[in-house]
């Protein structure tokens, strides 16, 4: 035995540490958890412990060692409706795993798994059942003959349960799973591993030994691999003897805090409240890790997943009776609970809490808008709320279906529940397709062929002109041997001076040429460290093996270099002027401008922008010489170098240092001294999503051109306003004051016209069953004036007033306006201005809405105005007559 038992392992931290220590002693290299934002473009989030090793399994990346072990944070949302409902479904979970890359195989994997669970975790043999693929006699034999498990404890299952594959083609193989039996007293006859109350699968051993081709044929892999996974939360439930994962020390402290805020007790709560508590507890862990790994709430991709999780937390908080802001308090508990194993949570504490706070406040406002939308649907007169609209309320505004149904029924309206379920199922299918599978296949000719090329050597930091050899030519993503004049091509070289788009910086442009060849290069991309040169052949024939020269446009390279250095200076200035916690969320370094996205909950003030510009320009004038060095990532971070949030870096990194000003990990091109930038100017600052701001700026010649254009504009305005530049401010102020006075005079005239028309009709009110009804047409008034006339008439007629006005503001526009205003008494007998105006406006192809005592609407068909007003009179006559009969 390689690991000696010291004490019984119980806590989540102890379980994790014991797993890693055990396999470390078996010569496995401990690999830190990768980010939840994967390098793999086929999946949105890290959904399995093996995902960071996918390039190794595909042979696209060198293995970190022959053996590896990790505790990988993961997120899955394809079964989100089961979170909190079942005992063990989660969005966020930790997967403990041990991996072999062409080293040990079934025997060692099974033996060590058994040693770990029985000797280290001290599980009783009586509580363990194992499953194997029914055709994998080798694994069954190891379990039976070498481990000594009784045959009755070995369950053979089919391909659906115990044969792992990533897709229709690619690496695959049988697996063996370990189950914990909570009720061994029930015996071993007729075991049903699908019985979730009795069994829980906690350790899966995948034996990756085959490759499946497009015909379904299995062939042995050259190197056989092991991929295992043990759910930390499930093992905690077992060892801590809890009813479910949520009551373990990994999650329950968060739930206790929720109970404290909601002033309820978990164990005496009903099932409905427990589900809400579990959902908030689960989602808290997912949310803090997503934000820490660089995800910002938005309506797309990962940002939408984050937003959806936060909104579910708010909604379930409301179901628990929590009406005030509470998520930051819950998140703080989650951070404190996990920061020892994930120190990035502590480092990003302020960012996490701020992002959650902003999103919670924003969603509470959104909920109010959702309630208004539902009110509009009800007041529109529809008798059925469609499944699409009900799902929109649920998905966009967080309105649960049962609440929509309840409110609709109160207003005698039905909801298309079946249509809602169809929309829900369609979304689930989209989610599963996007997040359930790890694709270990390479689709597309270009994708596959790129793997055939060696890494492109980039020598463009010091050179713009150099020699190279053509290694690959693509036409329409197909690898060819040659291409000719006029064709658009994608070229792979052995080495290049062209910078490939990365780190926000655009790719270089220029030419690839020889004596009889000229290719205009208009973009360069990087894919798997292979540089792809996009261009058009202007002269000659391009062939594999051809010797050429690469010539980068020096003017455009200089512009990009200046903007990239300016971006570094901008980030340092933001940290200095706004907040040290400001971090990059994205960037664009183009030839003509730069764009920088960063986290900030508030807009940057004009005063702050001025200070940022002044600071950057002072650094430019100080003529700092840049220092660029390669060093280990750990050394760079120790020296204080700034790394982009969520970005992946190699062990050796390139550090760009502006002494005393900025130090960042960066692979981009830069100027030699800051004075080469010339000048710096911010041209815009705006919010692009919740908690994320964007600055666009110029440097060098682009900044000078901007100043020149602005100066020309000032001169044009001076000529137009007949004032010299120094008097423009005063001149515009005077013009604005004159305009305000003129508008007041115009409004006064409109009010006089409205009063005249109001006075001419106020005596025409009719008395019906003691109510004063006035239905009339008033043309030539805008919306405000018509509203004012209606309110004045209502005030004049008193509590029993019913005023309905319609009119044409401007005959040329051919639009109608309607206003309905009611006194207190008509409202008391059930009249509703919003419902009345909808019926009237519909006659004229319009619509509107409002409150019980006041509403307004617009319409298009002016020829039906008289019909609409006649309808209003008849409707009121019938309604009031029927009321008098009661």
UniProtKB/Swiss-Prot annotation:
CDD domains: AlaRS_core (cd00673). One of its GO terms (molecular function) is alanine-tRNA ligase activity. Its cofactor is Zn(2+). GO terms for cellular component: cytosol. Pfam families: DHHA1, tRNA-synt_2c, tRNA_SAD. InterPro entries: aa-tRNA-synth_II/BPL/LPL, Ala-tRNA-lgiase_IIc, Ala-tRNA-ligase_IIc_anticod-bd, Ala-tRNA-synth_IIc_core, Ala-tRNA-synth_IIc_N, Ala-tRNA_ligase, Ala_tRNA_ligase_euk/bac, DHHA1_dom. It comes from the Bacteria. It catalyses: tRNA(Ala) + L-alanine + ATP = L-alanyl-tRNA(Ala) + AMP + diphosphate. Zn(2+) binds at residues 564, 568, 666, 670. Its EC number is 6.1.1.7. PROSITE patterns: AA_TRNA_LIGASE_II_ALA. Keywords: Aminoacyl-tRNA synthetase, ATP-binding, Cytoplasm, Ligase, Metal-binding, Nucleotide-binding, Protein biosynthesis, RNA-binding, tRNA-binding, Zinc. Binds 1 zinc ion per subunit. Signal peptide: none annotated. One of its GO terms (biological process) is alanyl-tRNA aminoacylation. It is found in: Cytoplasm. PANTHER family: ALANINE--TRNA LIGASE, CYTOPLASMIC, ALANYL-TRNA SYNTHETASE. Belongs to the class-II aminoacyl-tRNA synthetase family. Consists of three domains; the N-terminal catalytic domain, the editing domain and the C-terminal C-Ala domain. The editing domain removes incorrectly charged amino acids, while the C-Ala domain, along with tRNA(Ala), serves as a bridge to cooperatively bring together the editing and aminoacylation centers thus stimulating deacylation of misacylated tRNAs. Catalyzes the attachment of alanine to tRNA(Ala) in a two-step reaction: alanine is first activated by ATP to form Ala-AMP and then transferred to the acceptor end of tRNA(Ala). Also edits incorrectly charged Ser-tRNA(Ala) and Gly-tRNA(Ala) via its editing domain. This is Alanine--tRNA ligase. It comes from Prochlorococcus marinus (strain MIT 9312).
